[in-house]
Amino acid sequence: MRFGLLLLLPLLLAACRTTPVVLDTAQPFHDALATRTNVLGLTKGSEAERMAIERMKKFFSAMTEESVREQTRQVYAPEAYLNDTLKSLSGAAAIEDYFIATVRNAESVTARFEDVAESGGNYYFRWVMDTRLKKLRPGQTIRTIGVTLVRFDAQGRILLHQDFWDSTAGVFEHVPGVGTAIRGIKAKF
């Protein structure tokens, strides 16, 4: 009897073990990265690299509906992937529509780039963004900091754009009701 229980115990313990569920919010980024890994990019230190970096800086320095319409398809490759922590998009057309909607809901959107670093074909842009939203805190500037990972194609267009920033501080803390709850949660940590 005891021997039978000893044999049964490991089986019972194994049956009771659960595998934790992993909610992988990074999977779309990893999928986009994998499909854009072997794409020929820019030569480090080249004029094409310098121009691609300047195009990106100009695009985000003072976004308007007109500038977005004129520049998005020069800045982003047709098959580009973008995730700004608020939304994930594929394709320059979808990215253009998203940025147009963004600037329509804002009084102004400007970014100042403080640093750019390159490693293995990945470019990291450290920035400060000032946003004045029409409906959230009208008339007030919301300043946030972040880093954007960019991978360029051979024409200097963005293939991959992944933002790393605190979207709760940049947007959600300013939504009536929601902002109070988020600030309360943050205060408990």
Predicted segments, located by residue:
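A short, structured loop/turn motif at beta-sheet edges
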Residues: 116-123, 151-158
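Low-complexity, intrinsically disordered terminal/linker segments enriched in charged
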Residues: 23-37, 160-189
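A solvent-exposed, acidic/Ser-Thr-rich amphipathic alpha-helical stretch
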Residues: 69-120
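A short hydrophobic beta-strand element
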Residues: 121-131
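Bacterial N-terminal signal peptides
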Residues: 4-14
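Beta-strand elements of well-folded, non-transmembrane domains
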Residues: 131-135, 150-154
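Short, surface-exposed coil-to-beta transition loops
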Residues: 108-111, 142-148
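Short, low-complexity N-terminal intrinsically disordered segments enriched in polar/charged residues
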Residues: 16-70, 74
